Amino acid sequence: MKITVKEFQLLKSAPNSAYKAIMPEFLNHSNKLEGSTFSEDELVRLALDGKVQGDHSIDDVMETRNSIDVFGYVIDTLGQPTSEGFLIALNEMLFRGTSREAAGWTGHYKELANRIGGSSVQVALPSDIPTAIPELLAAYPDGSSSFEDIADFHVRFEHLHPFQDGNGRIGRFLMFKQCIESGVDLIVIDDENNDPYKAWLELAQTTGDKRFFYDLLHQCQTRFDAKMDALGVTRLIDDLHKSGQKPKRQRLGELQGEMTKASEQLNADAQRSHDHRSDHDTPDEDDR
């Protein structure tokens, strides 16, 4: 499924749109990959009603709530440069109000060497990050990435692991953003692919062999498309593509502008007509 920048931003602004199905599908799986205990229904309830259902830790509640805000921020800023400041903003937003924030571990690059849990991959050291991240961002210009470029960026970003925590979620947010901006079918990692995702990512990072990782991402694209089709979302997106209509608010503004110009023209014509009649109605000296 491909959705353009303008289309996605329009969906976000519209009530009862496909956005309300795509957002929880992405977040539910991305968060579960990091241990969240929220079900998709519970996440939707939190997103739409602001109510928490189920038994969850305070940090899980806050991070899940924050992930909804981060998703919205990513959509709002589509088309803007992926800068270091943008990455840091995502990390700060994701952990706002959590114990990680209180301990001072968020809103900046990592200060202590870290690792990927359950992996033998040796990630970058804190001293590497100030140079490595700018190089990574420069190597993959915004809006011009192929499927392979996006996958390669993800492999490299996760290998750098620039933050003390939250790298997986931020990496998947970036992958989603890149897909939209570059016209690539959306990649949503399903939590049911947790083990192969981590295994093939590790293989790509340690050996440079990315074939299996590419295959997995293609499978995730196909699986996501099938889910959206079952929910009726594909039909909505196809109609959006076909219509090519401008957002109604934009069109309404244009119509109002046209009406204002027409009204001004009518007033001007009426004034000229009045002035013309006045000239003809003025009595001659002999008639006075």
Model segments located where?
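FIC/Doc superfamily catalytic core
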Residues: 1-165, 169-288
